[in-house]
């Protein structure tokens, strides 16, 4: 901050001298070049410092996650070899999955041939609820935003079948092996929150309770009927009417408000809120390799965000 202020003062003085013809044009150009060079290298230095600070922060967070996972209880059963993926057209038409995401799905199947792969479209989801969870069907239909419906379904599907859910824009990097199966529930890191991030209203409440990361739900896994999955499902189910009423007050053209609302009601913030309140945290394994938007070393979330 001091350097930026000093450089700003230098620039103002320089402009003053030029305006009053105290400096020659040649001298002014030289000083401008000096100022530009200082600014350039100052920003490069700041970027380097920020990168180092972020690297150190993520390393610390990695140690925090290791400590959390050290308390994990032994899984009574392993996560079943099931992979669930979903594609629903907003316009209600037949699935038109983008080519790159079809490749991710194909790669997922090739890397995990021993897994049962279940793909749901809009009609499949409707039938699933009508057949298995009629009490949740109304919630699914009533949730005000398209992505909320899909969020709700992914939680119910994993609660029902067990296995792993992956967004279509998640690129597999290596096969799911025994080490990932030997947990009762697995969630990745969505976002880390350093000291600067903690000033953001979205992250501040988590930082205040020492929760410096958000859990992701672009990919996760669990055994069937896992109690944490039940918490996610029932919390949305029980609050659906409140969500509907809040949504009515949101300006449809205000995308930022819609995104924030979704994050908090069915998205990563919602999952993190449930995790913070969940007493049996030792039932969950936090999958982290120090990076955001990854499923450990197994997959990377490309964050295409077509729902936005």
Each model region followed by its residue ranges:
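Glycosyltransferase-associated regions of secretory-pathway enzymes
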Residues: 2-150, 166-308
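Small-residue hinge/turn detector
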Residues: 151-163
């Amino acid at each position: 901050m001091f350097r930026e202020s000093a450089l700003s003062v230098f620039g103002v003085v320089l402009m003053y001298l030029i305006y009053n013809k105290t400096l020659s044009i040649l001298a002014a150009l030289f000083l401008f070049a000096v100022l530009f060079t200082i600014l350039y290298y100052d920003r490069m230095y700041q970027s380097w410092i920020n990168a180092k600070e972020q690297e150190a922060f993520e390393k610390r967070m990695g140690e925090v996650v290791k400590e959390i996972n050290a308390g994990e209880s032994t899984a009574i059963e392993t996560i079943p070899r099931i992979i669930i993926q979903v594609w629903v057209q907003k316009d209600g038409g037949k699935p038109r999955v983008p080519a790159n995401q079809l490749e991710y799905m194909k790669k997922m199947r090739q890397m995990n041939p021993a897994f049962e792969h279940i793909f749901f479209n809009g009609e499949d989801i409707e039938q699933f609820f009508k057949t298995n969870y009629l009490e949740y069907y109304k919630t699914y239909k009533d949730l005000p935003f398209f992505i909320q419906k899909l969020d709700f379904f992914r939680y119910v599907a994993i609660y029902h079948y067990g296995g792993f859910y992956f967004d279509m824009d998640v690129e597999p990097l290596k096969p799911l092996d025994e080490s990932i199966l030997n947990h009762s529930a697995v969630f990745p890191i969505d976002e880390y929150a350093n000291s600067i991030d903690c000033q953001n209203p979205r992250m501040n409440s988590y930082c205040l309770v020492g929760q410096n990361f958000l859990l992701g739900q672009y990919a996760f896994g669990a055994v069937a009927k896992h109690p944490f999955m039940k918490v996610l499902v029932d919390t949305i189910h029980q609050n659906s009417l409140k969500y509907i009423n809040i949504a009515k007050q949101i300006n449809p053209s205000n995308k930022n408000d819609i995104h924030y609302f979704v994050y908090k009601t069915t998205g990563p913030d919602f999952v993190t809120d449930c995790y913070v309140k969940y007493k049996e945290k030792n039932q969950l394994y936090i999958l982290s390799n120090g990076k955001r938007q990854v499923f450990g070393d197994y997959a990377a979330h490309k964050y295409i965000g077509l729902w936005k």
